[in-house]
């Protein structure tokens, strides 16, 4: 019995108004060599986890290559299911991280050079990054400094009342369908390693929910590109009856079927 792992990356390209056939397929990659399967053990990382990290890097590379190869004069959007902020990298040793993050940043650089906007789509986000600012309003001290004013009582600090409040909860009462909230720059520590690919996010009422949208800085600074990308996201959600159809179909393509 051969011990191996299969990464099957779904690829989807949907053209609209161009009379072109869609691309619906997947790229399988089998890992079976000991140097691929067990390299992560030196860092104390289980093989299953390491394969998940490898998949993240491979997905970024495949997306950039695919988007650049099919780019036309028509507006183009590269979409990722989930966050562009890879929190798991923060806990990895430097040698392990250097095998995952550089290919991702290189892929994003290709998209930037091709002027293809990149968006990370998060459904049912549980983030509290923006609502954390409400803690300032609840702080009774002149300058927020938990270590100085609230030592050894973090379970009872005045600002803790906002702990259970999610960003999407606030935005549900503020946004109408089709509207987006303000742009925020994420302060995740791992972004210090992203070089110029700083990640911003906003919340968009897509009709069925409040979705979190993440984009690199080079998309945000191009207002036309950013607005166009958000419009394409809304169109994708509408066509998918509540969820981006391209992402949903990519999931279907990635499923390994017997036959």
Task: Show the residue positions of the predicted features.
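Acidic, metal-ligating active-site segments
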Residues: 1-37
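Long, contiguous domain-sized segments
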Residues: 13, 36-77, 82-259
């Amino acid at each position: 019995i051969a011990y191996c792992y299969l990464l099957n990356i779904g690829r989807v390209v949907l053209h609209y108004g161009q009379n072109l056939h869609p691309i619906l397929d997947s790229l399988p990659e089998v890992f079976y060599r000991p140097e691929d399967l067990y390299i992560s053990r030196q860092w104390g990382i289980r093989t299953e986890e390491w394969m998940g990290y490898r998949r993240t890097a491979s997905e970024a590379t495949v997306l950039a290559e695919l988007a650049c190869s099919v780019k036309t004069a028509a507006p183009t959007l590269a979409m990722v299911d989930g966050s562009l902020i890879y929190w798991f990298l923060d806990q990895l040793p430097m040698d392990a991280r250097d095998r995952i993050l550089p290919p991702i940043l290189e892929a994003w650089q290709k998209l930037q050079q091709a002027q293809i906007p990149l968006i990370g789509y998060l459904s049912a986000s549980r983030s509290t990054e923006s609502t954390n600012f409400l803690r300032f309003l609840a702080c009774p001290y002149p300058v927020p400094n938990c270590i100085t004013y609230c030592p050894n009582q973090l379970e009872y600090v005045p600002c803790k009342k906002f702990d259970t409040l999610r960003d999407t909860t606030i935005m549900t009462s503020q946004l109408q369908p089709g509207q987006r909230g303000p742009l925020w720059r994420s302060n995740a520590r791992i972004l210090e390693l992203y070089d110029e690919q700083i990640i911003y996010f906003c919340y968009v009422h897509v009709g069925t929910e409040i979705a979190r949208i993440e984009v690199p800085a080079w998309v945000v600074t191009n207002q036309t590109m950013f607005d166009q990308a958000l419009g394409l996201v809304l169109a994708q959600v509408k066509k998918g009856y509540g969820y981006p159809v391209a992402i949903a179909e990519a999931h279907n393509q990635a499923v390994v079927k017997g036959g």
